[in-house]
């Protein structure tokens, strides 16, 4: 299966679970302490990263999605540091601050790429009333299309059954990264993502793939799940659903440096993809591709849609789909570094017809990559008047992204794409119709940067206006 990249700007995910702060002290070591037989590290750098459920939220936000995070913290400096870091990454935090508990913090001392010691500052949260977290969930559920419950057995999910029931009552799917052998506590969830060790802790030793499928189906039926996604390390992943054939996804990892946080990445990409409307099998394929990227990085890590797109398609393949402006600029820079010629065009593309397809195919033939900039709904309304667009922005972009000729689709809200074009600066800017080159928005900027501008002919007899009039007139 080769999935297409969704528009993660349209995704909204609520993450509830055990939030943590990972701290790293890094420096060289060249001697042994005279006080004890331990190395002395001269700390030169320190780094802070959100961990646990906070890492899941950070992954959703890194894709461009709306991430809402609920969890338990202390009234302390680590809580402030965690909140500041997450909010700078556009994660919406709604923490329950408890005066008698510390924020879970893990301090790692590193030297020469090796971890010398880890110091944990934590106390498992216990006997915490359900109301503070449930009320925060209830306030956020109308804003999201998926819920992730991230369980590290630290106490934030003490009332997990109430959380599942609230989400299902709101009609929102619930994805759970489980901890421990008690799957009963997750009864009624949409999907669990156990790794192979966690799965075998519940069902016993798995002999082969057939045995995996049989035991997985039993788990689904016993605990009223809709699906299981079993992550299997070098063997990839297996998606199991009731009364459906299993989907085995081979690993896409090229090199494995660190599996830390890979489970967080899997469930974040899975939930974010489903929240954009992707079917479950395609969302799992995207999560599998994402896992292949992050295990090649050191420590808990996020990935961008550019990295995910390249994992899906390969850097030389047909395209990366819907993308935002910031990531487009980065992608174009990488394309130039590969020596690729980048072509750009723009339009409303309200009702895609044969003329559009001929035009885009012609534009794509003029270079190695084709960008299509699309007017948003508000922009189309100003240009075309009442009743337009017929199709909203996300649907128009989805159709364009499905064309083999198109690499990237990006929205713009202004009346013209001049600002966007001047930021991207394609190698070649093309426009269809009978324009003079001097009148094409962004043309002067492209030429000034050493690029070209061309006008392409439209196919005769094809127009969106003509199609709309024909429909109104009842003609086929």
UniProtKB/Swiss-Prot annotation:
Main enzyme class: transferase
Q: Which InterPro entries match?
A: Bifunc_HldE (IPR023030), Carboh/pur_kinase_PfkB_CS (IPR002173), Cyt_trans-like (IPR004821), PfkB_dom (IPR011611), RfaE_dom_I (IPR011913), RfaE_dom_II (IPR011914), Ribokinase-like (IPR029056), Rossmann-like_a/b/a_fold (IPR014729)
One GO cellular-component annotation of the UniProt record comes to: cytosol
Q: What is its EC number?
A: 2.7.1.167, 2.7.7.70
Functional pathway: Nucleotide-sugar biosynthesis; ADP-L-glycero-beta-D-manno-heptose biosynthesis; ADP-L-glycero-beta-D-manno-heptose from D-glycero-beta-D-manno-heptose 7-phosphate: step 1/4; Nucleotide-sugar biosynthesis; ADP-L-glycero-beta-D-manno-heptose biosynthesis; ADP-L-glycero-beta-D-manno-heptose from D-glycero-beta-D-manno-heptose 7-phosphate: step 3/4
**Gene Ontology biological process terms from the UniProt entry:** ADP-L-glycero-beta-D-manno-heptose biosynthetic process
Residue segments, region Cytidylyltransferase: 344-476
Is the Membrane keyword given for this protein? no
Task: Report which reactions are catalysed by this protein.
Answer: D-glycero-beta-D-manno-heptose 7-phosphate + ATP = D-glycero-beta-D-manno-heptose 1,7-bisphosphate + ADP + H(+); D-glycero-beta-D-manno-heptose 1-phosphate + ATP + H(+) = ADP-D-glycero-beta-D-manno-heptose + diphosphate
Q: Which Gene3D superfamilies match?
A: 3.40.1190.20, HUPs (3.40.50.620)
Q: Where does the record place the region Ribokinase? A: 1-318
Q: Which PROSITE patterns match?
A: PFKB_KINASES_1
Q: Which domain of life is it from?
A: Bacteria
Question: Listed GO molecular functions?
Answer: ATP binding; heptose 7-phosphate kinase activity; heptose-1-phosphate adenylyltransferase activity; phosphotransferase activity, alcohol group as acceptor
Cite the HAMAP family for this sequence: HldE (MF_01603)
Self-association and partners: Homodimer.
> By its UniProt entry, which PANTHER family does this protein fall under?
BIFUNCTIONAL PROTEIN HLDE
Describe the family membership recorded for this protein in Swiss-Prot or TrEMBL.
In the N-terminal section; belongs to the carbohydrate kinase PfkB family.
From the Swiss-Prot or TrEMBL record, give the protein name.
Bifunctional protein HldE
Gene expressing this chain: hldE
